[in-house]
UniProtKB/Swiss-Prot annotation:
This is Sugar fermentation stimulation protein homolog. Gene3D superfamilies: 2.40.50.580, 3.40.1350.60. NCBIfam families: sfsA (TIGR00230). It comes from the Bacteria. One of its GO terms (molecular function) is DNA binding. The lineage of its organism: Bacteria, Pseudomonadati, Pseudomonadota, Alphaproteobacteria, Rhodospirillales. CDD domains: SfsA-like_bacterial (cd22359). Belongs to the SfsA family. It comes from Rhodospirillum rubrum (strain ATCC 11170 / ATH 1.1.1 / DSM 467 / LMG 4362 / NCIMB 8255 / S1).
C-alpha cells in the first residue's frame, strides 16, 4: 500500500483520549492529529518519538492530520488500525499469501453472522468442468504492534488490551467453519522488527484461550510482517510463525 501523498514528519508530544495525538511538526507547528487506534498502544506512543502524519485534502475535516507511523528505536511501526485491512487485501490480490490466493472475488466489510462484518470475504466461481467452487473464506485481520522483548527478532504480542470484540470474532470464525466455509485470522505485524507473533495471555487470557479453541475447530491462522517506509508506504514482506497459545 503506497501513500497517495507524502507524509508530514514531526515529533510526538502525547497521545490522549484514545483518538487524539499532539505533534510538533518539523517546521515547529503544533497540531492535533487523529489517532485511528483504540488500543493501549503500549510500546508505540513514547513522547518525543519521530512520527509521520497523513494530510487530508478535505478542507471541512475537523482534524487535518492522521497519525500513520512512529519510529521506535531503529524500527518503524504503523499505528493506524485502518491500514491492515488494505495491506492484507493487497497482499491477497498479489498472491503473497498462497493459501488465500486465486479466489475470483475479494470483498471487504461484508455483513455476516448476526450483527458483524467480516474484514475480507473471498469467493470463487464454479470450475469450468462443473466442479464445485472452493468454499467461501472469511478473513479477519488484526493489527499487531506490542513489543516487549528487546531483541530485534523478538515476538510481537497481541492483544495490547483486553478485547471482548476480538474474542467474539474468533467465535464467529469458528461458526463459519462449522457451516462448511473456510475462516482465517490474519495477524499483521505493522512493524519492521519482530520475528514471531505471540498471544499476550497475561493481558487477555480469554482471547488467548479463544484462539486455541478456534484453531482446534479449524480456523486458519496467518502471521505476516511488514515493510513500513515513511517515504513510500506499508506492505507485506515476510511470513512469521505463531508461538502457540
Amino acid at each position: 500500500m503506497l501513500f497517495p501523498t507524502p507524509l508530514v514528519e514531526g515529533r510526538l508530544v502525547k497521545r490522549y483520549m484514545r483518538f487524539l495525538a499532539d505533534v510538533i511538526l518539523d517546521d515547529g507547528t503544533a497540531v492535533t492529529a487523529h489517532c485511528a487506534n483504540s488500543g493501549s498502544m503500549a510500546s508505540v506512543k513514547e513522547p518525543g518519538s519521530p512520527v509521520w502524519l497523513s494530510e487530508s485534502p478535505n478542507p471541512d475535516r475537523k482534524l487535518k492530520y492522521t497519525w500513520e507511523i512512529i519510529r521506535v528505536g531503529d524500527a518503524y511501526s504503523g499505528v493506524n488500525t485502518g491500514t491492515p485491512n488494505a495491506v492484507v487485501a493487497e497482499a491477497i490480490a498479489e498472491g503473497k499469501i498462497p493459501p488465500l490466493a486465486g479466489y475470483a472475488r475479494l470483498r471487504r466489510e461484508v455483513k455476516y453472522g448476526k450483527t458483524s462484518r467480516i474484514d475480507i470475504l473471498l469467493e470463487d466461481d464454479a470450475a469450468a468442468d462443473d466442479a464445485p467452487a472452493r468454499p467461501r473464506c472469511y478473513v479477519e485481520v488484526k493489527n499487531v504492534t506490542l513489543k516487549r522483548d528487546p531483541a530485534w527478532d523478538g515476538p510481537i504480542d497481541f492483544p495490547d488490551a483486553v478485547t471482548t470484540r476480538g474474542a467474539k470474532h474468533l467465535l464467529e470464525l469458528a461458526d463459519m467453519v462449522d457451516q462448511g466455509h473456510r475462516a482465517a485470522m490474519v495477524y499483521l505485524v505493522q512493524r519492521t522488527d519482530g520475528g514471531a507473533v505471540a498471544m499476550a495471555a497475561d493481558i487477555d487470557p480469554a482471547y488467548a484461550a479463544g484462539l486455541k479453541t478456534a484453531i482446534a475447530k479449524g480456523v486458519e491462522v496467518y502471521c505476516l510482517g511488514c515493510e513500513v517506509d515513511p517515504l513510500r508506504g506499508i506492505w507485506v514482506n515476510r511470513a512469521l510463525p505463531l508461538i502457540a497459545p
